[in-house]
Swiss-Prot record:
GO biological process: D-amino acid catabolic process
Protein name, as recorded: D-aminoacyl-tRNA deacylase
EC main group: hydrolase
Motif (Gly-cisPro motif, important for rejection of L-amino acids): 137-138
Species whose genome carries this gene: Trichlorobacter lovleyi (strain ATCC BAA-1151 / DSM 17278 / SZ) (Geobacter lovleyi)
């Protein structure tokens, strides 16, 4: 399971021009689910993301977590994170989880975030989405867990 996380001032996701999720200050998560991923990996990622101290304190040091600043999460599924571009010019998605398994684990991840006590907004699984965000910093991390 791969997550690209970005510290944001704001973020939103729309489907067919209709806004389906938006947050102010917080973390934007793009989540890719691969074959062999587990609920334990989803739980670990959710806990890590909520507790990661990537927000600045009064001294300007990254020392505050999402819960410390009262932030929210915008979680968007992105199966292309499972893409492999090593051969040829077209990405291969052979390692991506099948849609039903991907949705189950994405939903589990969203539930795990909510159980951490933070507000969560989402996109729509398998939809063609338009994502807009203001990356604060910029601050971006890639997290992986199997």
């Amino acid at each position: 399971m791969k997550a690209v996380i970005q510290r944001v001032s704001s973020a939103q996701v729309a489907v067919h021009g209709e806004l389906v999720g938006q947050i102010g200050r917080g973390i934007m998560v793009l989540l890719g689910v691969e074959k062999g991923d587990s609920e334990a990996a989803a739980d670990w990622l959710a806990e890590k993301i909520v507790g990661l101290r990537i927000f600045e304190d009064e001294a300007g040091k990254m020392n505050r977590a999402l819960t410390d600043i009262g932030g929210a999460v915008l979680a968007v599924s992105q199966f292309t994170l499972a893409g492999n571009c090593d051969k040829g010019r077209r990405p291969s998605f052979d390692t991506a989880a099948p849609a039903d398994e991907g949705k189950r684990l994405y939903d589990h991840f969203v539930g795990a975030l909510k159980r951490q006590g933070v507000p969560v907004q989402t996109g729509i699984f398998q939809a063609d989405m338009q994502v807009a965000l203001v990356n604060d910093g910029p601050v971006t991390f890639i997290l992986e867990r199997r």
